[in-house]
Amino acid sequence: MSQKTLFTKSALAVAVALISTQAWSAGFQLNEFSSSGLGRAYSGEGAIADDAGNVSRNPALITMFDRPTFSAGAVYIDPDVNISGTSPSGRSLKADNIAPTAWVPNMHFVAPINDQFGWGASITSNYGLATEFNDTYAGGSVGGTTDLETMNLNLSGAYRLNNAWSFGLGFNAVYARAKIERFAGDLGQLVAGQIMQSPAGQTQQGQALAATANGIDSNTKIAHLNGNQWGFGWNAGILYELDKNNRYALTYRSEVKIDFKGNYSSDLNRAFNNYGLPIPTATGGATQSGYLTLNLPEMWEVSGYNRVDPQWAIHYSLAYTSWSQFQQLKATSTSGDTLFQKHEGFKDAYRIALGTTYYYDDNWTFRTGIAFDDSPVPAQNRSISIPDQDRFWLSAGTTYAFNKDASVDVGVSYMHGQSVKINEGPYQFESEGKAWLFGTNFNYAF
């Protein structure tokens, strides 16, 4: 695995933390910004205004609130992602539960200024990913540890033009932190085999090099990359109210440009750099810098909410993410030399969701939803550190209102991912995944 390949995987992982659902929505986006939304598979989020969390999706919904409103909570993600396969060396590539559990917190506040204007703020984690393999895992050169976290700070405002039309605009500041580690696994054995099968294997020097490669311990850290950075963008929304029971929304989230500076190191001896081997560039434990610019894709969403009966409502969404903007990754050194330039060729992807809400009485509200997440990652670009796949959602939830001011939301979703094949480096894998998500939020109107 060359430094080009290593940097590509690391950069893509950083991109994942910022633009998209492996923390459980296809394309690596995190949808988990509220527990009420979780209970309806995030259907109709741009048009529903049942708590302050919806405003982080569509700022135009601020005009639906007549009192300052607060919401805070978290979603617990319990994934079950398993990898299987056999290395060319004969070692097993089986790894269970490679994605650890995680908490995704959220906090929202909305405040009307008058009948026409209002503002809101939120703290969410819109993107994230974590996969962990044992340090001695045979495929450690493409597995290892991938740990990515983000925090999104949003400030937005809204204007009501008349009884039908409202408009909202928001500013987003995204903080991202990434840590990537890769280990030798059985890569040394595979490299030694390649050398011995080549003309170099007939020479004393080549045989000595093969012996050295074959002696690399599985837990040797062949690459380490970490970094953090801020990125900025904006979002906007339009809300059309046909009447008090029927409303529709169009929302937009802009591209975000992220300029990363990361620290790269490898424990391999620098002597390996002289032979053009398929391993990361060796630094002998020293650290060097790498720079990466990512233009993260925009997202559009159309939503609707229809209260078809005093006790029943249906809601739906269609989201479209312009992943085709993500065509390549390019990293450079401090001197400006290209460290890698790799064609990614992502395709645009969509998410469709449908749900229903039952207003039982003044205290109890029940909701359900289903959704389908289309993966933007072409089969040839899948990775075990980012084992993306199409996903299906089944969701249910409830809200209990203590009084007219305070309420609590509870939501649960089950996600099922398709079984997929992954070809990465010299390895062939099969991956299957599913997840349970549990969320709760407390809401208060002042």
Swiss-Prot record:
Residues 1-25 form the signal peptide. The keyword Transcription does not apply. Induction: By long-chain fatty acids. Expression of fadL is under the control of the FadR repressor. The keyword Ubl conjugation does not apply. It comes from the Bacteria. GO terms for biological process: long-chain fatty acid transport. It holds the Pfam family Toluene_X. It is found in: Cell outer membrane. GO terms for molecular function: ligand-gated channel activity; long-chain fatty acid transporting porin activity. GO terms for cellular component: cell outer membrane. PANTHER family: LONG-CHAIN FATTY ACID TRANSPORT PROTEIN, OUTER MEMBRANE PROTEIN NMB0088-RELATED. Belongs to the OmpP1/FadL family. Involved in translocation of long-chain fatty acids across the outer membrane. It is a receptor for the bacteriophage T2. FadL may form a specific channel. Has been isolated from outer membrane preparation as a homodimer. This is Long-chain fatty acid transport protein. It comes from Escherichia coli (strain K12). The gene is fadL.
